[in-house]
């Protein structure tokens, strides 16, 4: 993260998301500010809190994609949650504190994967030795003389060479492997998650690690042994400690569909999943301490990014206290036909390239002409205007319908080039786009 300036972060996001420059700039600055804060000396560092972001824009314009790509760039603990999944404390459903518990779980998993990767080379060596021990029992254990030991060592090196070159991959061996711990899930009422985690930990620690003999091919045994050896080399306590610290200093929470928990003035009735959830979110966003099975987590420096379409509600419908917790507001614009053309062709994993790669696996060479791409974008845009505007997601539907015949009869086109031009697009989608009723149900 320290290597990326805001301009470089925006450049990376441009590879995957078309337009929405204001939103990209805001998240880039917020991400860079995490690193800047780390360079400030205490006690001032503790006073610098992240400025949370509220992204406002219609569906399918890139709100979720911006958050998803940002998480990959940050390489920080990240979780995306739907605000509608939570209920006020005391009601049936998940309470908002579980957001932080899930974030810590994600951080522990991320730290474990990182540490395991560091230890992989050593784990591979240990796994290799264990397989060689099965193939060639150690000479000293069998009571052989020194010259026999030297001969055994030479044989071991020959087998090691064969093992590394993959010549023994399909050979079956019987090897002792640790049996994985069975995770027992205990469901508890809201507010008793701490007790639940303690009970789970107690049951997991009851049985010692058991081992059993398994008959496997060397290829499969090697994978399992590498994982087992790597887990032995990782210090679990240090790992959890670093994960907790990482969450507190670099954690990012993306709250999607926050507009769905607004309480509109014209509606009446229970607001279990609306104002109650907003009130519960307040301390979380402001800064509080949450109890998890890995210890107490302070949320003061966790960055919250909220997003919503706000079709039926306005940001001002959020309770005033929560509005104040999201000082940076960014409005995302609807996508034009020109944006659709760029989405189809200019991003790193554009739709056109994805379908070309998929059909290439069956020997079909798909070729899109520029006028076909333009016509497809125009049709998708027109359908969005006539019916519900679902943004770039309309392109997925249109592309599936366009290539339905080619995908179904791919074997007939094996070794051929299938050219998609404007006439082909009109033939497949023209009538559907012109009929509003058909477009509503098919596109």
From Swiss-Prot:
Listed SUPFAM superfamilies: P-loop containing nucleoside triphosphate hydrolases
InterPro entries (UniProt xref): AAA+_ATPase, ATP-dep_Clp_protease_ClpX, ATPase_AAA_core, Clp_ATPase_C, HslU, P-loop_NTPase
Q: Could you tell me which CDD domains the record lists for this protein? A: RecA-like_HslU
In terms of Gene3D superfamilies, this protein maps to:
1.10.8.60, DNA helicase RuvA subunit, C-terminal domain, P-loop containing nucleotide triphosphate hydrolases
The principal localisation class reads cytoplasm
A Gene Ontology molecular function term of the record = ATP binding
This protein's GO CC annotations: HslUV protease complex
User: Which Pfam families would you find in this protein's record?
Assistant: AAA, AAA_2
Which keywords accompany this UniProt record?
Answer: ATP-binding, Chaperone, Cytoplasm, Nucleotide-binding, Stress response
- What does the record give as the function of this protein? ATPase subunit of a proteasome-like degradation complex; this subunit has chaperone activity. The binding of ATP and its subsequent hydrolysis by HslU are essential for unfolding of protein substrates subsequently hydrolyzed by HslV. HslU recognizes the N-terminal part of its protein substrates and unfolds these before they are guided to HslV for hydrolysis.
Q: Which NCBIfam families match?
A: hslU (TIGR00390), PRK05201.1 (NF003544)
UniProt family annotation: Belongs to the ClpX chaperone family. HslU subfamily.
Q: What is this protein called?
A: ATP-dependent protease ATPase subunit HslU
List the source organism.
Nitrosospira multiformis (strain ATCC 25196 / NCIMB 11849 / C 71)
Q: Could you tell me the gene encoding this protein?
A: hslU
